[in-house]
Amino acid sequence: CSDLAYSLLLSREYPGWLYEVEHGATTIWERWNGIHPDGALADPEMNSFNHYANGAILEWMYRHMAGLQPIAAAPGFQQIRYAPQPDGRLQFCKSQLLTPFGLYMSEWEITADALCFSLRIPCSCTAELVLPDAPPVIHINGAAHPYTPGMTLPSGTYRIIYAPTRCYYVRYDLETPAQVVFSNEKLLALLLQIVPQTASVPPVLSATAHESIRALLDASGISLNDAQRKELESAWAAIHQWDL
């Protein structure tokens, strides 16, 4: 669910939250495609351009991206569940939440070999830790601590670092989904430069293909020689995921 939510958040095509932003939105639309790509308006009978309702995303961003989740038994955020869900498509997240008990601050950052979290818990409050892909031992404020999901931290400021059990640092190679390659100018430019025959792939197919770029090229009858394969993977490996 988190992967799909991030896709909706970051996509500039419909259905995607940034589709509205790309078309000039400064408030939430009733329809996420209230303006068509050609500039035409959707059905005026249901086409408010200031319609903050179920299409809003900030609650999801605070609860799941930042990880600040209230607990019903402790109203007012006196106790929270800290369960952030980083995604490799974003390098970092910073958030603040002012509650009746004080200010919470949550930050995370993805590096090549670690997940790094910063959490500020206000006075008289506590947080249950539910960390993503955490190993049995994590580092809290520079010291090693055994990690158990649901362990509680009292009020204070914490820096949590660990090497996750799965990789969050995105690397591009021939197993990258074709849709990702064709939707990024840098990846596509290198592909066309090194494998010019890729230009013959039908635009509709390239834009919707969820299989790997290797599978798409094979299905299109395009074969890479060893030199092309090595040059392409070397060029893609040099691209930082957040530069795209």
Task: Mark where each language-model region is.
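Compact, charge-rich alpha-helical regulatory domains located at protein termini
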Residues: 170-231, 236, 242-243
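Non-catalytic C-terminal accessory modules of carbohydrate-active enzymes
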Residues: 3-169
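A short structural micro-motif
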Residues: 11-16, 197-198, 239
